[in-house]
Amino acid sequence: MALQDVCKWQTPDTPRPSIHLPQAGGWAVPRGCDPQTFLQIHGPRLAHGTTTLAFRFRHGVIAAADTRSSCGSYVACPASRKVIPVHQRLLGTTSGTSADCATWYRVLRRELRLRELREGQLPSVAGTAKLLAAMMSCYRGLDLCVATALCGWDHSGPALFYVYSDGTCLQGDIFSVGSGSPYAYGVLDRGYHYDMTIQEAYTLARCAVAHATHRDAYSGGSVDLFHVRESGWEYVSRSDACVLYRELQKARSLEQELEAKACGIYPEPATPQGARECKELFVEQEEVTPEDCAIIMKTETM
């Protein structure tokens, strides 16, 4: 929740000029109309679909995403890049409108470079997240759609922040954004712990995105994997999501078979006494003859 929501603050009717986008404010709307109201009524409704995730652990920050860019049922690009480098120690995942994400990441790079020249150092990950949230909050209510997870390493260690176009800025250990995020969260919540090894983190990220692409119709293609270390970010791999999911299913089936054998779901009797007890449990009942009925009736009359 953004600070504006907590304070019950509403965006002004006329957006103020932005110092970050010099051409902002010249909205192509009829004269006398409020841009915010006009866009909410007549603006195009764009379809979004993606799966991006990031999580922080002892050895840095992992960022992963699928590569399918889609607009509804139309697949625009099966091999797009949804994890964008900002500088040597900072990455960002992109979810939302592609044009908005690309524009604001260019603006963010420019602002960070200017601050580096003025102050002699780059801002922290927290400062970068607050800067991006403040810049985009000027366009709150104008159908801007940018949801990003900033993954970086600064003087405080690995850091992860979620920033949304309405000004929301959250810090956390796990974030997943996009239409496939509910499926990715299910895998992440089950396998995540802060002290995991690097290979465990790689496997968890690939597994989460692969499961999301299998269940979410708007995610697919391949799985891009990045790792942010103290020395900088590293591009780990790109794996086909369909092939990866099949391999995970085979590994899961093999693991279940081994667990079944180890737990002894179909155990054999360990002793002759156990064998006799099992045999008694499944022995067939003898048929009741007329002589038996006569004996029973005689016993009842007595």
Swiss-Prot record:
Reaction catalysis annotation: Cleavage of peptide bonds with very broad specificity
Phenotypic consequence of gene deletion: Displays defective development of CD8-positive T-cells in the thymus.
Signal sequence segment: none
Key words, A-Z: Cytoplasm, Hydrolase, Nucleus, Phosphoprotein, Protease, Proteasome, Threonine protease, Zymogen
Top enzyme class: hydrolase
GO biological process terms, semicolon-separated: CD8-positive, alpha-beta T cell differentiation; proteolysis; proteolysis involved in protein catabolic process; T cell differentiation in thymus
Taxonomy, superkingdom: Eukaryota
Record flagged with keyword Ion transport: no
EC number(s) recorded for this UniProt protein: 3.4.25.1
Single GO cellular component term: nucleoplasm
Molecular function (Gene Ontology), one example: threonine-type endopeptidase activity
Residues annotated with Phosphoserine modification: 253
Coiled coil region boundaries: none
Location in or out of the cell: Cytoplasm; Nucleus
Pfam families: Proteasome (PF00227)
Active-site residues per Swiss-Prot or TrEMBL entry: 50 (nucleophile)
Residue ranges listed under propeptide: 1-49
Tissue localization of expression: Expressed exclusively in cortical thymic epithelial cells.
Family: Belongs to the peptidase T1B family.
Record PANTHER family: METALLOPROTEASE TLDD, PROTEASOME SUBUNIT BETA
Subunit record text: The 26S proteasome consists of a 20S proteasome core and two 19S regulatory subunits. The 20S proteasome core is composed of 28 subunits that are arranged in four stacked rings, resulting in a barrel-shaped structure. The two end rings are each formed by seven alpha subunits, and the two central rings are each formed by seven beta subunits. The catalytic chamber with the active sites is on the inside of the barrel. Incorporated instead of PSMB5 and PSMB8.
Function: The proteasome is a multicatalytic proteinase complex which is characterized by its ability to cleave peptides with Arg, Phe, Tyr, Leu, and Glu adjacent to the leaving group at neutral or slightly basic pH. The proteasome has an ATP-dependent proteolytic activity. Incorporated instead of PSMB5 or PSMB8, this unit reduces the chymotrypsin-like activity of the proteasome. Plays a pivotal role in development of CD8-positive T-cells.
Protein name, entry field: Proteasome subunit beta type-11
Organism: Mus musculus (Mouse)
